[in-house]
């Protein structure tokens, strides 16, 4: 099975690392590529820095692609060339167009840092803390058109302690 991984920040690394380990132990699984956001300027000096997913993927010998858009002919051609059976999406940072969601034979699976349907979209862990929630979690689901919609496959809860911060929740998920 050919899997295309799409992710950008540290949160996506846990899943990518697990997928790399699994693919190395199972010849029937191949990571055909990693799609991540383009390098962005950061800090006071606006130094161009790569996303954490790009750094790890390159260190792991995986092909990395950083398209500006998922809606042009160039990306459609890349998708056709990679021909993934499944796309795994973890905190990629852009909404996937229907053409991408519908492309792989087994669909797209998303890992989201909240107990959906609560906190769809960006910064779900931070929003749970701001709202004073006592628990949050992670949801794995098949993707559908729309923001964090689709059939849920798995949900796991995580208690938010009185002194927990973003880092505690991030690492706990």
Where are these regions (language model features)?
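N-terminal Rossmann-like dinucleotide-binding module
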Residues: 1-44
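Solvent-exposed polar/charged
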Residues: 21, 58, 80-81, 102, ...
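Positions that flank functional sites
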Residues: 39, 72, 144
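Internal alpha/beta domain cores that form substrate/cofactor-binding pockets in large enzymes
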Residues: 2-4, 31-35, 60-82, 87-89, ...
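N-terminal beta-loop-helix "entrance" segment that forms/cooperates
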Residues: 40-60
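Donor/substrate-binding cores of folate-linked one-carbon enzymes
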Residues: 86-173
């Amino acid at each position: 099975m050919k899997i295309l991984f799409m992710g950008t920040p540290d949160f996506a690394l846990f899943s990518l690392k697990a997928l790399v380990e699994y693919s190395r132990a199972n010849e029937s699984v191949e990571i055909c590529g990693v799609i991540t956001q383009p390098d962005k300027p950061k800090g006071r000096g606006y130094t161009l820095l790569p996303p954490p997913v790009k750094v790890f993927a390159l260190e792991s010998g995986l092909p990395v692609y950083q398209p500006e858009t998922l809606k042009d002919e160039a990306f459609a051609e890349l998708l056709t060339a990679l021909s993934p059976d499944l796309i795994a999406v973890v905190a990629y940072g852009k909404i996937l167009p229907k053409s991408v969601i519908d492309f792989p034979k087994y669909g797209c699976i998303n890992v989201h840092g909240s107990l959906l349907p609560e906190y769809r979209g960006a910064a779900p862990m931070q929003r749970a803390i701001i709202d004073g929630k006592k628990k949050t979690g992670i949801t794995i689901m098949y993707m559908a058109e729309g923001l964090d919609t689709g059939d849920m496959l798995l949900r796991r809860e995580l208690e938010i302690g009185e002194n927990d911060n973003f880092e505690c929740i991030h690492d706990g998920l």
